[in-house]
């Protein structure tokens, strides 16, 4: 809980209240412990405190339990027994509550328990407002991790994004918004690989095929619902309601079944916050607190380049007013370069059954500033549920001496809410309907499809034009061939007829016969020539028909 006297009150030890310093809340934190030791309740208590201080939070709800933060908590026997530890009360103020099994402080009870304003989100759009990002926003580095690409395939994906960016300079609609845009761009680059080889590098068909197969797997996981528009506006995570910070709860029970998609999505959110928010330095309170549950998923199978980027984002995002709190089983799940930046720590019990477990306990103990009152490593193994070793940063940013403490109980409901309650909260949200309908505007897929259609039409027209020219050429040759044959036939007929006439005339002169008239000779020449032409044309036509 939060009040002016104790600040962000999280736990209580024999020396008094243990609270997070608001100015140091953006220095990040860690909640660690074995399964069943109370990590989720601690997360809920922290989130409530930030909420009451007017700080919005984002958290992933793995089992649905965190949805209870939207409802007012109730007194229970367990809480009643622990109440005096956290809130010393004068017994004379006790009054009987008819709904309780024992006397309660009714007035105090009604003021103490309270709900938080909540918005539910869901990547799949089933249990909350949809959350989407475009392929371009996700970028090749995160997409490569998401698809599990090797170094060569990762290089090809970077080339495809670079070509898409360059093409977008010529055509602003050449955008990579959803998975079909990326698939179309991969096909396009593969088909024009030789053209781009000199400027961008080699793009092999095998690498493109591997990326296409990885895209199919992504679609099978439901990632196609995540990529697209309208893309999520991160400022919708940074709102208040009645002076309280809104708790943004991501339904992750289905999402966590795809660890790569879950961790990459949250990493994208962090990257968007880092790249979008302005520098503000240290503030009285953070602008946003980001709880990253199952944090080990973020660092599993992560390349050195991406790990460096994660470390950079975590190191620099605090100057944007954002605090990141990792939740995991053991501090050893977090790389040292990241672990060293987590100043506010709550360590629940760890079990040490194997040498590896014992080493993890020692590592966890070594991250705390020692307390001479107890041995840290032994205490970690003997903590009860709801107990933890706690160390927060002081006003100067130095870690305080570790204390064995009891975590405050949540003031909101512990456990999941009903589907009806969830639906009511979703419908009452100020952003209800903003992200519900996916928009599919013109982008790379449509542009490239249009280009392909135009090229296909142009190719068909060119082919048809060539066929027409070919037919014309063929027809011209045929006509020329017939005329040549006709001319030859006429020449032959005339020559042979003239020869015959001349021969007859010479013979008649010698024999003394009377020669036929010139007209008769001419008629004979014409008649023979005509007959020859007719026979030639007929033979040519019949020959073509037979062919």
Regions found by a protein language model. Name each.
Residues 1-17:
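N-terminal pre-Walker A segment at the start of P-loop NTPase domains
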Residues 13-22, 238:
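Pre-Walker A adenine-sensing motif
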Residues 45-47, 70-90, 312-398:
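Conserved ATP-driven motor cores of ASCE-family P-loop NTPases powering translocation/secretion/packaging/pilus
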Residues 6, 104, 129-136, 147, ...:
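Conserved P-loop NTPase motor module
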Residues 47-57, 64-77, 84-312, 338, ...:
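P-loop NTPase motor domains
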Residues 31, 35, 302, 331:
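The conserved Walker
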Residues 39:
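Conserved lysine of the Walker
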Residues 483-510, 518-545:
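Membrane-active amphipathic alpha-helices enriched in small hydrophobic residues
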